[in-house]
Structure formats: C-alpha cells, structure tokens
C-alpha cells in the first residue's frame, strides 16, 4: 500500500511541478533583420533580439528550411560593416525564405473588390464564418471608402505541388478548455504511426496566458516526440468587436498597436524557450495594405487557408487546413476527427520548399 501511495505521489509531484513551470523574464525584445554567420559557417537571418538573465539572444531563421532557433548573440558572427551585410543579403536573395517573404507581402491591385452588402458575417464565440458573393474565386479584397480590407491574404496552400496537407490550428482567446479529445487523438495517432505528427498552432498571447496548463501540456507532447509543432504568431489579444464593420475590426481596430500585438506573442514564446516561426496568421484572416506592409518588416509570411472546414471548404493536396483548437468552433473539429488517420500531414515549412529539396 505504501508503494502505491508513493507512486501516486511521484506522479502528482511531476504533473504539478510541470504545470507551475514559470516563464523566464524577457526584456528588450525587438525586431531586426540581420544576416549572421553561425558556428558551423551557415548564413542565417536574425529576426529578433532580446535579453534574458542579462544575456543577449537572437531568434534565427534558416533561409533554406524556415527552421528557427534561439542562440546566444556571442555565438554568431555579425557583418563587419554595411557592405558585408549587403553582400550577405544578396547571397540570400534566392533562398526559399526570401522568395516567400517577397511573394506573400505584396498586394495585387488587380484583385476584384466587393461592397459591404455583398457578404454577411456570422460570429460565434470569437469565431468568424464568412459568406460572400464573388465573381472570382481568387479575389480576397473588399474596398471600404479609402481603405482596402483584405480577407484571407497570404499563403492559403503550398507554393509547390505536394502529396499531403498542412494542419493549422487556431488558438484564439477563449474562456473554454481546449479541444482535449482532438489533441489526444493526434498523440494516439503518433503512437500508432511511431512518428511525431506535424501540426501548426497559430497561438494568441492571451490564450497562452489564460490556458497555461494546456499550453504546457502541448509543449510536453512536443518534447516527448508525439507532436511536431510549428508555433505561429496569431497576435496577442486577437481583438474582435461584434458591432463593428471589418475595416474597424480585428487588428484593423487599432493599427497603431500592431507592433505590440505582434511582439508580445513572440516575447511569451521565447520566455518558454520556444523559437517563434517566421509565419503569422491575421485574426479573422482580416488585414489591409498597411498591416501587410508592416508584416514584412517583422520578417513574417502571412498564412491564410483554402480549407477552413467549418466554412465547408474541401481539403486537397497542398491545402492549409484550418480548425480551431480552443473549443470555439466545434464544427471544424467534428469534421477533422474522422479524417485524421487518412490525411498525410506535413510540416508547414515544407509548403514553401521546392519538392526536389
């Protein structure tokens, strides 16, 4: 009996100690775009710098793989001068990261516009479902007075032909527990297939702050090799107002606060020693030309979706599947659950890499 009680105590101790794990204090977190040379002589791009415990760190992007890492600044070689920096950037011009950054941060002015009364918005618990009438399937912009609202701007599917799909899971702020059955199903699938399941979690800062234990549980599945998670910035507060039109809603409601909305999420992630990915998903998939231009300055590639399941969109090879893991949109989860074992899920980074790599 004593052995059983001791065993139970050990389990409870480790579970509780993990749940109360505290994030490190991060200061001076800021965006940069600086080519550096790593210890193994590779050229990478520093997109963030910050201080932790009085030590300086970079978040680096590998421009050939989109993989990110956190390194001490003292372990990389910086360009000696402006000319050397420019020469390094020239060498990076043909890399997959720079190509994607340029491709998905440019507004095509030829996109067809449509008026406010040509679509309706349906919101339920922070979830938005759009129903609109467009003559062109490729059109994602709507013009309101002097500003242009963009819907679903960015990469909505793979840049190159692939056999497989990309599962993106939005974690908007929510008062509900996360989709536990769904995430545990992914872990079970990992055990069955004997490999980590690649998923992309588009996370808001408020969700992490309000659901720390669930966030840490996800990290644990990643550490244990069950889930291969790419962490995508989904803004800090994911603002939404039921009584406002799109041009004054989501991040368009306060464009002056855009930098803070973006940087606070990254700051939270690095405090847990997570290297943020070079991707961003606009709340509600709503943006405009101003925010898209700013996004490039942060080194971010915007992610949309051509398979938002709750909207009735169908999955194809190369699709960026969109479901909500925060329990605010059950329809998408109900649809994806029976499909999970049949899908060939790929890491989001592979969507931007030529298939011969």
Swiss-Prot record:
It comes from the Bacteria. Keywords: Signal. Residues 1-19 form the signal peptide. One of its GO terms (biological process) is carbohydrate metabolic process. The keyword NAD does not apply. InterPro entries: Glyco_hydro/deAcase_b/a-brl, RPE3. Transmembrane segments: none annotated. This is Uncharacterized protein RP012.
């Amino acid at each position: 009996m004593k052995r059983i009680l001791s065993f139970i105590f050990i389990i409870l101790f480790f579970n509780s100690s993990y749940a109360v794990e505290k994030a490190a204090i991060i200061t001076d977190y800021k965006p940069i775009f600086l080519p550096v040379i790593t210890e193994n002589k590779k050229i990478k791009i520093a997109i963030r710098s910050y201080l932790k415990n009085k030590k300086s760190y970079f978040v680096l992007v590998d421009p050939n793989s989109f993989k990110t890492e956190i390194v001490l600044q003292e372990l990389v070689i910086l360009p000696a001068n402006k000319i050397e920096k420019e020469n390094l950037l020239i060498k990076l011009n043909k890399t997959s990261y720079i190509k994607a950054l340029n491709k998905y941060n440019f507004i095509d002015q030829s996109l067809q516009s449509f008026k406010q009364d040509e679509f309706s918005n349906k919101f339920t618990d922070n979830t938005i479902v759009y129903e609109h009438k467009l003559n062109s399937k490729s059109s994602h912009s709507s013009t309101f007075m002097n500003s242009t609202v963009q819907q679903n701007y960015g990469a909505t599917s793979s840049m190159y032909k692939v056999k497989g799909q990309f599962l993106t899971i939005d974690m908007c702020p929510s008062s509900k527990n996360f989709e536990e059955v769904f995430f545990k199903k992914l872990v079970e699938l990992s055990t069955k297939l004997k490999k980590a399941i690649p998923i992309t979690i588009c996370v808001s800062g408020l969700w992490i702050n309000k659901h720390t234990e669930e966030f840490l549980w996800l990290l644990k599945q990643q550490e244990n090799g069950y889930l291969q998670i790419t962490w995508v910035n989904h803004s800090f507060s994911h603002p939404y107002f039921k009584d406002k039109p799109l041009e004054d809603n989501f991040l368009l409601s306060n464009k002056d606060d855009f930098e803070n909305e973006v940087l606070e999420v990254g700051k939270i992630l690095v405090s847990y020693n997570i290297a943020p990915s070079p991707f961003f998903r606009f709340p509600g998939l709503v943006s405009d030309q101003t925010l898209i231009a700013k996004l490039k300055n942060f080194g971010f590639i915007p992610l949309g979706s051509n398979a938002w399941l709750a909207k009735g969109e169908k999955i194809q090879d190369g699709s960026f599947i969109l479901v909500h893991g925060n329990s605010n949109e059950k329809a998408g989860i109900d649809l994806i659950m029976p499909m999970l074992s049949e899908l060939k899920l790929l890491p989001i980074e592979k969507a931007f890499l030529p298939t011969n790599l």
